[in-house]
């Protein structure tokens, strides 16, 4: 099978090539996004492999179909960028990687949490300038505080497992409670309760039409003053404009974002010599109590190996006509 891989970085290529030694697919790597204009580059390929910011809308899928593509392989868990109804109508099979390394994402979320709490990012900059003052670096002891986790799939449960080690009270919201979470002593509550009682809130849920801007002005108003929020899931779970206002009035004490709702034209690229045109992003990133990372929570050697293995195994199952447990349509 010939496979066109879009949005490729060197780390993608390295691990896909290593894992492909066991599969023998013909891999063609492209460093640009899949769009309606670039879909023609998949000509002659039976499958395409895409990531979070590639375009899987109906026009793109129709173009891929014209060029003989049969399979769409997402090398990520989220699939909100793919029109599944259109794929089904066109007879295209879509597969994903539902769980690759939950601990990798959870550990990154914890890293953001600790960095924000103890102002490590600010201390790093100060000490580089020989400024060893501790003024303005006071954090809080996490032991005994309340953590609210929204979404208790594998990543959410991994997060809860770590937070339990901090000695925190654990609250969670998910329409489908997890037995693994309950075993950790997690208390499932409704969103208003989670918002009002949590000192720290961490998002670990997929993006759906129902939870778009889940954290909006109304949600922020229900939260404790000075709440910490960390998002390693999907950017559009947070209303960025409302977050700015909540930061200004100190409702949000600190905000960690590994994802951003308009990240498509920013993340995964070197923009250090560019003038960022996104004014909302610029306002957020200018805040000393906001920490951005560029959608890197998944980026460990173990996770990249797992993603590559599952992606190619999914395609192998489809090629052989076997049942694929990760098939969406």
From Swiss-Prot:
Keywords annotated in UniProt: NAD, Oxidoreductase, Stress response
Enzymatic reactions: (R)-lactate + NAD(+) = pyruvate + NADH + H(+)
GO MF annotations in UniProt: D-lactate dehydrogenase activity; identical protein binding; NADH binding
Amino-acid positions noted as binding NAD(+) in the UniProt annotation, renumbered to this chain: 154-155, 174, 205-206, 211, 232-234, 258
SUPFAM superfamilies xref list: Formate/glycerate dehydrogenase catalytic domain-like (SSF52283), NAD(P)-binding Rossmann-fold domains (SSF51735)
GO terms for biological process, alphabetical: lactate metabolic process; mixed acid fermentation; protein homotetramerization; response to heat
InterPro entries documented for this protein: D-isomer_2_OHA_DH_cat_dom, D-isomer_DH_CS, D-isomer_DH_CS1, D-isomer_DH_NAD-bd, NAD(P)-bd_dom_sf
Active site (UniProt): 234, 263, 295 (proton donor)
Catalytic activity, EC: 1.1.1.28
GO cellular component: cytosol
Pfam families linked: 2-Hacid_dh (PF00389), 2-Hacid_dh_C (PF02826)
Family membership noted in the UniProt record: Belongs to the D-isomer specific 2-hydroxyacid dehydrogenase family.
PANTHER family: 2-HYDROXYACID DEHYDROGENASE HOMOLOG 1-RELATED
Entry function: Fermentative lactate dehydrogenase.
Protein name as catalogued: D-lactate dehydrogenase
Gene: ldhA
């Amino acid at each position: 099978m010939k496979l066109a891989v879009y949005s490729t970085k060197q780390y993608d290529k390295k691990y896909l090539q290593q894992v492909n030694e066991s599969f023998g697919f013909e891999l063609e790597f492209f460093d640009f996004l899949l769009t309606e204009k670039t879909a023609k580059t998949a000509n002659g390929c039976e499958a395409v492999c895409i990531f979070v910011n590639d375009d899987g809308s109906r026009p793109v899928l129709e173009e891929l179909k014209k060029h003989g593509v049969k399979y769409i392989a997402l090398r990520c868990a989220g699939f909100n960028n793919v029109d599944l109804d259109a794929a089904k109508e066109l007879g295209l099979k879509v597969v994903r990687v539902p769980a690759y390394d939950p601990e990798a994402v959870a550990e990154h979320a914890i890293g953001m949490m600790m960095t924000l709490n103890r102002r490590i990012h600010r201390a790093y900059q100060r000490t580089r300038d020989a400024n060893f003052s501790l003024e303005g670096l006071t954090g809080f002891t996490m032991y005994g505080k309340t953590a609210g986790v929204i979404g208790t799939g594998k990543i959410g449960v991994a997060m809860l497992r770590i937070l339990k080690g901090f000695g925190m009270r654990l609250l969670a919201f998910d329409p489908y409670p997890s037995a693994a979470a309950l075993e950790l002593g997690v208390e499932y509550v409704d969103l208003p309760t989670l918002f009002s009682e949590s000192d720290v809130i961490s998002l670990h849920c997929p993006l759906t039409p129902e939870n778009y801007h889940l954290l909006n002005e109304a949600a922020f108003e229900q939260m404790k003053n000075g709440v910490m929020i960390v998002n390693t899931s999907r950017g559009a779970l947070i209303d960025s404009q409302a977050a700015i206002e909540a930061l200004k009035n100190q409702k949000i004490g600190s905000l960690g974002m590994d994802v951003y709702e308009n990240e498509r034209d920013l993340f995964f690229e070197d923009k250090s010599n560019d003038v960022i045109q996104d004014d909302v992003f610029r306002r957020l990133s200018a805040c000393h109590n906001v920490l951005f990372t560029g959608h890197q929570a998944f980026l460990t050697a173990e996770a990249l190996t797992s993603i590559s293995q599952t992606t190619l195994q999914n395609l192998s199952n489809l090629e052989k006509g076997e049942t694929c447990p990760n098939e969406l349509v």
